[in-house]
Amino acid sequence: MSRSARRKTSALNTVLRVVEVFASIQGEGPFTGTYSVFVRLAGCNLRCPFCDTRYAWSLEAGKPLGVEELVEEIARYEPSLVVITGGEPLLQRHPLNSLVEGLESLGLRVQLETNGILPAPARDEQLWRVYHVVSPKDVPVRVPGAKLHPSWVDYARATGRAWFKFLVANEQHVREVAEYVAKLGIPRSRVYIMPLTPEKLDMKELLELHSRIASLAVKWRLNFSPRLHLLVQLP
């Protein structure tokens, strides 16, 4: 590879297309309630009809930001956790590894949210060491084109740093999740079910939905994830 080509590759690996950076609490999954900085990356490989961040679907929706500049912006918030979300963050895999390296150099914990279509990190990637919350969309919501890459199950077993989170609306959905994780050999301790929230629910309806899904989690011996940020009206 020529010197100019190497410079070009290096530049690509240190620039991310970023939709937004903001502070909130992590409202979902194993780190619920943690003060966090969210980094929303542009681009997604799915078109989920229930998606509440459609503005991040296109790669062009993001502003190009250098990794060093982005790390400095994140550090100013002094977060307990950095949540990298999307879109689908792994579409920007190479610069994402550079971002993780920069964040870890500051001693920051990193959690990545993914739909699990793309392969799990390899051992030689910076991403191998971060926490992952995988939200498969092939069960029970069945989004076209969604299929969990089998490497995520192996990654979870090898590292203990991955959890699987499923959107559910009723008991049939929960039954499908239970059958799915049993077939793949995913321990229930690594599985969360979370309410699939339609648009325009008032607070009473939102609380009732959370109560129903939480009761189903107990019945089926699964972990329950609220959507805490919705309940407390944070971004």
UniProtKB/Swiss-Prot annotation:
Cofactor comment text: Binds 1 [4Fe-4S] cluster. The cluster is coordinated with 3 cysteines and an exchangeable S-adenosyl-L-methionine. Binds 1 S-adenosyl-L-methionine per subunit.
Binding of S-adenosyl-L-methionine: at which residues?
G87, S135, P136, K137
The record lists the catalysed reaction(s) as: 6-carboxy-5,6,7,8-tetrahydropterin + H(+) = 7-carboxy-7-deazaguanine + NH4(+)
Identify the InterPro entries for this entry. 7-CO-7-deazaguanine_synth-like (IPR024924), Aldolase_TIM (IPR013785), rSAM (IPR007197)
Q: What is its EC number?
A: 4.3.99.3
Record-listed Mg(2+) binding positions: T53
- The signal peptide stretch is none
Keyword entries, A-Z = 4Fe-4S, Iron, Iron-sulfur, Lyase, Magnesium, Metal-binding, S-adenosyl-L-methionine
Q: The Radical SAM core domain covers which part of the protein?
A: 31-235
**Which cofactors must be present for this protein to function?**
[4Fe-4S] cluster; S-adenosyl-L-methionine; Mg(2+)
What family is it from?
A: Belongs to the radical SAM superfamily. 7-carboxy-7-deazaguanine synthase family.
How this chain assembles, per its entry, is:
Homodimer.
Protein task:
Catalyzes the complex heterocyclic radical-mediated conversion of 6-carboxy-5,6,7,8-tetrahydropterin (CPH4) to 7-carboxy-7-deazaguanine (CDG), a step common to the biosynthetic pathways of all 7-deazapurine-containing compounds.
Q: What is this protein called?
A: 7-carboxy-7-deazaguanine synthase
- Source organism (scientific name): Hyperthermus butylicus (strain DSM 5456 / JCM 9403 / PLM1-5)
